[in-house]
């Protein structure tokens, strides 16, 4: 990914992982992947993530990429 040193909107990041899906479907898929990975979910919560958040910090993006791979 070209820039993990910036905040990513949740849909913006989701589309990078699932570019052929609609933005809503891409976000639902990314959210499902996150929720299925307990270690990732715990790390994101430790970094301050809540389900109502609209963006991911660079540290959160880094952890997502660690567990899910680079989009």
Regions picked out by a protein language model, each given a short descriptive name:
Residues 20-55:
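Major-groove DNA-recognition helix of helix-turn-helix-type DNA-binding domains
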Residues 2-21:
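Polyanion-binding surface elements
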Residues 54-71:
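A short, Lys/Arg-enriched interface patch at domain edges and termini
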């Amino acid at each position: 990914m070209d820039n993990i040193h910036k905040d990513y909107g949740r849909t913006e990041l989701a589309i990078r992982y699932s570019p052929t899906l609609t933005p809503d479907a891409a976000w639902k898929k990314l959210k499902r992947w996150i929720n299925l990975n307990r270690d990732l979910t715990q790390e994101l919560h430790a970094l301050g993530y809540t389900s109502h958040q609209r963006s991911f910090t660079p540290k959160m993006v880094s952890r997502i990429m660690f567990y899910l791979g680079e989009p």
